């Protein structure tokens, strides 16, 4: 018997290790009592309805008059009704559930031998946050849409938490923090920076329903990270077809040039254009729903501002290198004539960063006790970079930059960082009776970070840099 118990404990711990940071739902709890005696009502029926989608949840009060419904859909509004034979029905509407939190809603019931009707209470004050599990900040979709944001990123939104600074929380290293999307971990597995994969933003802001920022939570579902984390859930379809189309644009004219009395001078030309749409609705009313989002953004990138000099004299203020045009031409012609290798232009460094995001989600109310959500998203980001600018001579201890007033490069030395992220999650929330609930969550994430050379370089040649003599 002890051996079986030990094996069961090991299996349970193993399952818990796989289930890391799985916060995708909300919960509802409360107590039902009589209004005149404050006596607990045993066996009262609780029914909660997510009004936009018609999703229904049910529970029965226990011997202490308490009820709990786990695995509920985040958001609302919800309408909650309590009924018991011989008593007036009680109803509360307008309840909003927040991610990872438990909403507390109590009811008092009065006897009614005739049971003529029901009493409706609307707009009741929220009793939310009675079941906090650590310092947390919940950010609704309405707040996200009204919040000014520069780069439309998760970390930009997370600053509503007083602990957050990018992916750093309470002064901790951002690489020790955690980010989940519908329960899937989407962290920078390479660990070189604290930025999220997919160019720092693996999902469109218009596809997110709610964000929760947590710091040192003691919820056992949120583990395997130090300090803080961001949990986000995506939008779902409802019984109403809804869609949006949007375009965002910004350039250097939307940036200031002065700080106090200091003039920073003219800003270089830059701009970002973003196109996208969302669309969702019912496949089968009250039963099956879909939601889709696509977004594409492009931004011209200035990889190298430096130009070769006409007379061999450097002008750092105007980004003129002391490497003469004649030397650049000699090297280029030599490579073409003798090796049939074109290193590219030294006057033009064309580069355009772009980012594509796709997301699709299906929600299925299998029964009132079983609800399934399946989500897939894909992000591809392309960002251009110049050749590594640092250079060090071990013998002379001379340090300089390859792209500076001392050196120049050809466009063929550029390379792009091609980041792609594919993620899928399947989340089944089930309730078995009044006291048992279960979440079965399957997630898979594939992150690929490639380095690709410029279009003008397709062989194994090393990036070529021309540096003038000292």
Kindly give the residue locations of the regions a language model identified:
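Transmembrane beta-barrel strands of outer-membrane/channel proteins
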Residues: 123, 245-251, 292-296, 374-378, ...
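Periplasmic N-terminal accessory/gating domains of Gram-negative outer-membrane beta-barrel systems
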Residues: 62, 88, 93-106, 117-236, ...
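Extracellular loop and loop/strand-boundary signature of outer-membrane beta-barrel proteins
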Residues: 196-197, 261-265, 344-348, 409-414, ...
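Residue-level signature of outer-membrane beta-barrel architecture
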Residues: 215, 234, 281-283, 364-366, ...
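Periplasm-facing N-terminal accessory domains of Gram-negative outer-membrane beta-barrel systems
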Residues: 20-122, 126
């Amino acid at each position: 018997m002890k051996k079986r118990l030990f094996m069961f404990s090991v299996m349970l711990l193993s399952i818990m290790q796989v289930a890391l940071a799985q916060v995708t739902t909300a919960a509802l709890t409360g107590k039902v009592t009589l209004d005149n005696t404050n006596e607990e009502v045993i066996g009262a029926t609780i029914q909660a309805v997510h009004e936009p989608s018609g999703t229904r949840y049910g529970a029965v009060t226990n011997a202490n008059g308490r009820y709990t419904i786990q695995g509920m859909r985040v958001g609302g509004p919800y309408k909650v009704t309590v009924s018991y034979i011989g008593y007036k029905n009680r109803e509360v509407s307008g309840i909003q559930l927040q991610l990872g939190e438990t909403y507390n809603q109590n009811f008092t019931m009065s006897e009614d031998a005739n049971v003529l009707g029901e009493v409706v209470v609307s707009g009741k004050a929220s009793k939310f946050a009675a079941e906090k599990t650590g310092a947390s900040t919940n950010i609704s979709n309405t707040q996200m849409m009204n919040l000014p944001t520069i780069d439309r990123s998760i970390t930009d939104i997370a600053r509503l938490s007083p602990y957050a600074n990018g992916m750093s929380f309470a002064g901790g290293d951002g690489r020790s923090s955690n980010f989940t999307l519908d329960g899937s971990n989407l962290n920078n597995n390479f660990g070189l920076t604290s930025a999220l994969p997919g160019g720092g933003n693996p999902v469109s802001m218009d596809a997110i329903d709610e964000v929760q920022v947590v710091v040192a939570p003691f919820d056992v579902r949120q583990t395997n990270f130090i300090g803080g984390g961001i949990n986000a859930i995506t939008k779902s379809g409802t019984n109403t077809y809804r869609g949006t189309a949007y375009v965002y644009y910004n350039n250097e004219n939307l940036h200031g040039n002065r700080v106090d009395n200091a003039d920073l001078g003219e800003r270089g030309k830059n701009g970002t254009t973003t196109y996208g749409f969302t669309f969702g609705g019912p496949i089968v009313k009250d039963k099956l729903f879909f939601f889709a989002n696509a977004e594409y953004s492009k931004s011209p990138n200035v990889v190298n501002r430096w130009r070769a000099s006409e007379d061999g004299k450097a002008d750092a203020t105007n980004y003129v290198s002391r490497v003469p045009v004649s030397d650049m031409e000699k090297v280029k012609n030599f490579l073409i004539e003798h090796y049939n290798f074109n290193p590219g232009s030294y006057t033009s460094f064309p580069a355009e960063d772009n980012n594509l995001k796709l997301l699709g989600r299906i929600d299925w109310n299998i029964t009132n006790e079983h609800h399934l959500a399946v989500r897939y998203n894909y992000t591809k980001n392309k960002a251009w970079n110049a050749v590594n600018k640092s250079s060090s001579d071990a013998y002379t201890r001379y340090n300089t930059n390859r792209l500076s007033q001392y050196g120049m490069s050809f466009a063929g030395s550029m390379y792009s960082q091609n980041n792609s992220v594919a993620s899928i999650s399947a989340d089944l929330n089930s309730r078995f009776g009044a006291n048992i609930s279960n979440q079965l969550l399957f997630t898979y994430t594939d992150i690929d970070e490639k380095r690709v050379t410029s279009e003008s370089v397709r062989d194994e040649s090393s990036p070529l840099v021309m540096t003038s003599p000292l």
